[in-house]
Amino acid sequence: MGWFFKDTNLVMLQTPHVFFSPDPFERNLDTFHRMPNEGELFYGIVQDGNDLWNASFFCGSCAIIRRKELMEVGGIAVETVTEDAHTALKLSRLGYNTAYLEVPQAAGLATESLSGHVGQRIRWARGMAQIARTDNPLLGKGLKFGQRLCYLNAMLHFFYGLPRLVFLTAPLAYLFFDAHVFQATALMITAYALPHLAHASVTNSRIQGRFRHSFWNEVYESVLAWYIMRPVLVAFINPKMGKFNVTAKGGVIEKAYFDWTIARPYVVLLLLNLVGFAVGIGKLFFFSGDEVITLIINMVWTTYNVLLLGASVAVANESRQIRSTPRVAAALPAFLRFENGRTLVCKTEDFSQHGLGLSVPPDSDIPTGSRVSVSLFRSDEEGVFPAVVTFSGTGRLGVQFDNLSLQQQAELASLTFSRADAWISTWGTAQRDKPLRSLGSVVLIGLRGIGQLATSAFKSSTPRPVSPVSKDSTP
């Protein structure tokens, strides 16, 4: 809040969006807290860059906005489905300042399923295309040149759908039809393209190391490209089309399954690239000279696309999620009181809305079903909550809260989910990027995705045994 007193022209302060549950990429690929997620690049680097040019924008939550100035622009913008960014653009046009503080202050749930994740990104893409069409930052008054470029960059980002699909299919034009995508010799293409690709990879790795690993941008874009291409193009032509949808969050996935519906575009593209690669192998026996080099270049390109599409397929393999409320890893001081007067000092391993995982001395003999009072602390504040022991193991204890009142639930949230230090400890702490290691992880996940696709296809095609009808059964 101090920045609002220091700068009376400041109308909006945005902080990062942090998620205490894994998104579909992190859960289905098992990369949670080991690899930066899709959104960390934006909140770790892009918004900081926007802030340099006074162009950081509102992202819907985790922000403070002055009410008086908000009313000057008619309140939250409703003309587009990305009302947050559009509202910030309107405020910037009036000459007000916006700011970004890269210190997590709150956290929330990520999307549970890939279909929900795709639906959310479709709305973002459609909304940004609507703003670009109806309130283009390059046009109109009030913005400085740097602000115009920053807002334009945010909007044009979601137009990657068509270029990404072209990238995933371009080498097939040569493999199937002998059509040259580039009118140049194979040697010239290699001489110009390889140094550029190597330089771009090293540069991005150095700049984005903590917030985006090499080659993962291609995976994210490959998953979303098919689904955002049409909404973006339609919204840019007719910005009034499309409606606002709220992203559903929270829930369980009782059984692991392969989402054939959402994966259909990736599967088709994957099969096309595999067939193209097979055609390329056949042509190796008939081509000669420079044609062989051109063929090999296109086959290498196709191999890369196969791995990207395999990774995209792997994301569609939804893993089981039986917890209705996610657990957040955190080491917080805790204190247990038993009914017989015994006390025990311990620490939390994780917490959720309904219970705690506790680290206790290995020799603690605590039977399952014991009723305890759990104390949690924040500075000089203490909260006491009734609980029941549901798990007791060597050095570990699981407790479930017992009929908390509304006031106790609010106090629990204050001592756990509302702690800013709980989110700072995991922000930007993923391993720094190493391009070769990152490429290796994409290759392995791509191969795993192809294997999962084959397994799921086999299971789907295998007829299920039919149980015989009993003679005594009635119609």
Model-based region annotation:
Residues 90-106:
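Catalytic donor-sugar/metal-binding loop of nucleotide-sugar-dependent glycosyltransferases
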Residues 239-252:
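Juxtamembrane inter-helical linkers in multi-pass membrane proteins
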Residues 2-81, 92-93, 114-153:
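Long helical/loop segments within the catalytic core of UDP-sugar-dependent glycosyltransferases
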Residues 157-242, 258-319:
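Membrane-embedded multi-pass helical conduit in multi-pass membrane proteins
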Residues 81-87:
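Acidic donor-binding loop at a coil-to-helix junction in glycosyltransferase catalytic cores
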Residues 257-475:
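Structured alpha-helical
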Residues 102-116:
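Active-site donor/metal-binding and catalytic loop motifs
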Residues 110, 117-135, 215-232:
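Intracellular alpha-helical coupling/juxtamembrane segments of multi-pass membrane proteins
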